[in-house]
Amino acid sequence: MTIRFEEKVSTENAQFVCQWSNSLGKVFQEQWIGPRIPFLLTLQALEGVFSIFDEQEFVGLIQKIRLEDSNLHIGRFFINPQKQEQGLGGQALRKFVSLAFENEDIDSISLNVFEANQRAQNLYQKEGFEIVQMVEAPVRKYSRLKLE
């Protein structure tokens, strides 16, 4: 397994992401990208992301959402459902975090995950993220996790 990243997502790969997300349904999509982006996912909603490749195969994406006060907030991390449970998610997250910390302006990395998404929460905690806040949102509860 050789994970690498490319800034942006090609139209062809964005179509794969839309297919993957749409095939998992509205509930999954709201957990993954939030309720502001309507189901069915379209290409226009995928700006500002990095493509994740295993060798030459496109396997997922991750987004740098914002940098505030030396904290990089990331999100919309998604691995092809057919490639999950193979260690790609952990390896991709470790490498992305490692590359982010090479930037001297970044001291911490945060992300949000819905409480019901235990699989994602377990992955983030396994990779060293810690829950720093529980947020009661109008629709559902989520955790804010941070890695320093």
Indicate where each model-derived feature is located.
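Acetyl-CoA-dependent GNAT
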Residues: 3-82, 99, 103, 134-137
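Active-site acidic-Proline motif in GNAT/NAT acetyltransferases
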Residues: 80-82, 86, 115-116
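Conserved acetyl-CoA pyrophosphate-binding loop and the N-cap/start of the following alpha-helix
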Residues: 83, 87-96
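Conserved active-site alpha-helix within GNAT-family acetyltransferase domains
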Residues: 90, 115-133
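Structural preference for long, well-ordered alpha-helical segments within the folded cores
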Residues: 95, 99, 122-123
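Conserved GNAT acetyl-CoA-binding A-motif
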Residues: 102-112
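Conserved beta-strand-loop-alpha-helix junction that forms the acyl-donor binding cleft
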Residues: 111-121, 137-142
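Terminal substrate-recognition subdomain of acyl/acetyltransferases
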Residues: 142-148
